[in-house]
């Protein structure tokens, strides 16, 4: 399934440089859009984006989809439409192999909902390959985790959780008696904390809309963290007040508690405590897709991230770049890697849009420099909390409505890179009108 001008030559008969981007997450889609505008429109390159889904949803929104605070269908962006608007091509498929010698990637067959093959195994040729397939949750091999926990790695998983949550409330209402629902969240990083806060707000909304047989007090949320505190990536002056706020909101916070076993009834902790839970979410740790570890001679680390240099080229093949969560990129001379954050992928996409244009022109590539602008964590409609980095003031804490505005602006920045300022303003107005005529929680 392709959109755009077919073939490898432009209207002047000059062979175009073939750029293939695998993965349409925040970074991959931003890069395809920028390269399409910069190189695809002028016929200097043929830009192709490959993804296993037809639509894009900004991953930091998944906890809102899971709670029902956001309808995924209203926030998804169709890759075909974005490709048509921005002079690149889209091909639906899942990457399964790589032939470095002939410069081709292999895609798995496509199937319809009945299991019929609608497209056979295919290959796509490239001159420059960019891999941006993101990461998934790392269950660290914990027995039972894969069978009994949900992982908020994609919109389908978030929607599945939302449906199960709604079913619990609808079932209790139909039975007509007061019930208790236990939810356990493993991992108190940003995703775990944000989901806990959203679920606490969702409990109040369910009751307001008449689903009151599971009262807000009877939605028992347990947040489990193996480390000593919540939000370990943020300073203690930020994370400790967040933990206090969660406890005040009725969330049970258990730090220093490693999960050793998950079963249908709940989770077993290393300290011998058993946490009962009907709904279980694993949000601890990340790892890149397993297939990356078997791609040609490319080197990966222990969590399957492709090892890249400061130019974001893989260490074994200069024709292949990788960025975002799936890449282990050195962070200057710090001895650490660039953190797996949305802001890093955004910066790397902008860097690669310029670097790949230089590569086509035969010019040397610059080195990527990551700039940490701070971290923000949403606490649902109660606001947000986090740190911002300034050149003069260093790191400083923000919270409440101001932090919430900064948090929302991150999403608007992502939208602006995809649509431009005027269309983002139009979307903001449409969102505001929608909030005045729709329920605050998805109830279907």
Mark where each language-model region is.
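A Rossmann-like FAD-binding core segment of flavoenzymes
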Residues: 44-46, 86, 90-109, 200-310, ...
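Rossmann-like dinucleotide-binding core of oxidoreductases
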Residues: 179-234, 241, 252-254, 338-356, ...
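Short glycine-enriched, charge-decorated loop/helix-capping segments at active-site entrances
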Residues: 62-68, 146-150, 238, 296-299, ...
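FAD-site-proximal beta/loop scaffold in flavoenzymes
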Residues: 148-176, 265-268, 274-347, 354
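C-terminal, flexible cofactor-proximal segment of oxidoreductases
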Residues: 16, 353-444
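Beta1-alpha1 glycine-rich phosphate/pyrophosphate-binding loop at the start
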Residues: 13-97, 190-234, 281
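FAD-binding core/adjacent interface of flavoenzyme oxidoreductases
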Residues: 8-15, 90-184, 281
């Amino acid at each position: 399934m392709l959109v755009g001008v077919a073939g490898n030559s432009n209207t002047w008969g000059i062979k175009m440089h073939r750029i293939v981007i695998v993965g349409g997450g925040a970074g991959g889609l931003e890069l395809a859009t920028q390269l399409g505008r910069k190189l695809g429109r002028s016929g200097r390159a043929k830009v192709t984006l490959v993804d296993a889904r037809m639509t894009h949803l900004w991953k930091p929104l998944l906890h809102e989809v899971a709670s029902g605070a956001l309808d995924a269908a209203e926030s998804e962006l169709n890759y075909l439409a974005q490709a048509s608007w921005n002079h690149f091509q889209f091909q639906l498929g899942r990457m399964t192999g790589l032939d470095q010698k002939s410069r081709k990637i292999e895609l798995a067959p496509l199937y319809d909902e009945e299991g019929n093959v609608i497209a056979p195994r295919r290959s796509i040729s490239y001159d420059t390959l960019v891999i941006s397939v993101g990461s998934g949750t790392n269950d660290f091999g914990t027995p039972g985790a894969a069978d009994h926990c949900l992982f908020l790695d994609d919109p389908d998983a978030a929607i599945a959780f939302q449906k199960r949550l709604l079913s619990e409330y609808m079932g209790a209402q139909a039975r007509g008696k007061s019930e208790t629902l236990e939810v356990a969240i493993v991992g108190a990083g940003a995703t775990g904390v944000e989901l806990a806060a959203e679920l606490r707000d969702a409990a109040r909304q369910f009751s307001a809309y008449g689903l009151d047989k599971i009262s807000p007090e009877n939605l028992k949320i347990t947040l489990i963290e193996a480390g000593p505190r919540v939000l370990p990536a943020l300073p203690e002056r930020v994370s400790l007040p967040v933990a206090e706020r969660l406890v005040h909101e009725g969330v049970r916070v258990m730090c220093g508690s490693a999960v050793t076993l998950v079963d249908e009834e709940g989770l077993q902790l290393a300290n011998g405590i058993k946490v009962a839970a009907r709904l279980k979410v694993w949000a601890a740790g990340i790892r890149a897709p397993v297939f990356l570890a078997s791609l040609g001679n490319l080197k990966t680390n222990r969590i399957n991230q492709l090892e890249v240099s400061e130019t974001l080229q893989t260490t074994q093949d200069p024709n292949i770049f990788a960025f975002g969560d799936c890449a282990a990129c050195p962070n200057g001379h710090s001895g650490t890697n660039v953190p797996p954050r949305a802001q890093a992928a955004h910066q790397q996409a902008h860097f690669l849009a310029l670097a790949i244009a230089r590569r086509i022109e035969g010019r040397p590539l610059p080195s990527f420099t990551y700039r940490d602008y701070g971290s923000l964590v949403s606490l649902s409609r109660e606001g947000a909390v986090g740190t911002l980095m300034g050149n003069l003031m260093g790191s400083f804490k923000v919270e409440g409505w101001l932090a919430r505005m900064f948090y929302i602006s991150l999403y608007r920045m992502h939208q602006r890179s995809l649509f431009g300022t005027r269309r983002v303003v139009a979307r903001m107005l449409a969102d505001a009108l929608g909030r005045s005529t729709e329920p605050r929680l998805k109830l279907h």
